[in-house]
Amino acid sequence: MIRITQLKLSVNHTEVQLHKKIARTLKCPEGSFSYEIIRQSLDARHKEDKKFVYTVDVVVPNEKQILKKVHNKNIMSTEKKKYQFPKPGSTRLVHPPVIVGSGPAGLFCAWYLAKAGYRPLVLERGEQASRRKETVDHFWKNGVLNPDSNVQFGEGGAGTFSDGKLNTLVKDPNGRNHEVLKRFVQAGAPQEIVYQQKPHLGTDVLIGIVETLRHQIEEMGGSFRFEAKMTDLLFEEGHLKEVEVNDQEKIPAEVCVLALGHSARDTFEMLNRRGVYMEPKPFAVGLRVEHPQSMINMDLYGEEENEFLGAASYKVTHTCENGRGVYSFCMCPGGYVVNASSEPGRLAVNGMSYQARDSKNANSALIVTVSPSDFPDDTPLGGIAFQRDLERKAWELGEGRIPVQLFGDFRKNQASTDFGEVTPQMKGGFVLSNVRSILPKAVGDSIEEGMLAFGRKLSGFDREDALLSGIESRTSSPVRIVRSKEGLSNIEGIYPCGEGAGYAGGITSAAMDGIKVAEFICEKFRNF
């Protein structure tokens, strides 16, 4: 197989033009080869001449002869590495593995265990995806919160109500990344997510995909129980014996995968009481910022709209004078700011996009790093206490609605009274307020400095009427559940997994960690 890199075409090229370009590059007839796109990225450094840049793998009969006659540093021989799931171990497993949580980590752990014959049982405290969507829509419209089924909890996890980004910075030579994208495509995602530089699905598409993954798992012997919250774990001599559900039912189990998600605070508290080792983890907090999407497009594309490129996205970072980092996170082109609360009397926000990314605003979190030294205590749950305090203040400031402030007023530390040209694109009620008043001073100062710095990179980013809303507090898990190189916690049979356990950040990396934990289990235990 031949790999070609740095293959550039105009952004409005056709598939035929790509095929012809490959033929010219390899100096071979157009009908003599097949190809697969490995990667597509955008080069917009020259706004008047934007290019898609491709990496492609080409299968051609006379590969050696072509490589001899074509001397080009961007052309090389390559071999495709195929992902291999391990063979089952020898330890007898009496009961099916229990997986707590049906986010990407739990779903992908369940998928691979089911495929290998382990008949996993998935417990999910929230509702099935379609019912969950109805519950979330009702919350956004009427403010009635279901603490167990919301933007954070329910089938698909917190990522279901997000932009659905699938890119990850995790380097994985074992091929799990490609496995995740392949499974998404087989569950209904568009084929191009496999090779796009910044693939995304959108909330409307993700809901159907996670339901399809569930059906696949069930067809392979797995099972699901919704509105089934793990409320306790019962141990005997350092080994897992039972999983308690809804404070009543006890399920015998030798293996339990904790794919909890980053917001399962009550579960973290229970695990801490039960002596499961965990530690506080640095994370980041801040606000959502909204700008006109047309402005971001102009900054990055040199035009307000381009049918071949869609809504533009950005990523910005800055190191502040106080030593803290401030950066954009979970940027949602053509998206919405959403009320992402999961506890009564506390308010958190997140960003979300549909597949079309056709809202008039771009939004992103602007977040500032915080560490255990910022937390009110040095216990494993100190970060949770820090989050809860900020969310309580946000809820009180907006009286249950999302508090919003113009950047010009944020700089003056005064409540906003009217919108400028930028108007909110939000899911859930909102109210003009002084958002800065609830932030720790270091966080507020860092966001102001960051906004001004980003305005020097992206024209208009620091405009007076840019909207800030909060609080963005669920950027990653505030704890890490300690696990060994075999994937186990200090309690035999407990496997921490995914973002909530502190081993991932985002949909794809969480799914990859789910596969990794499935491998740990398979390497040790026999299947049924």
Predicted features along the sequence, with ranges:
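Residues forming the flavin
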Residues: 1-50, 56-161, 165-528
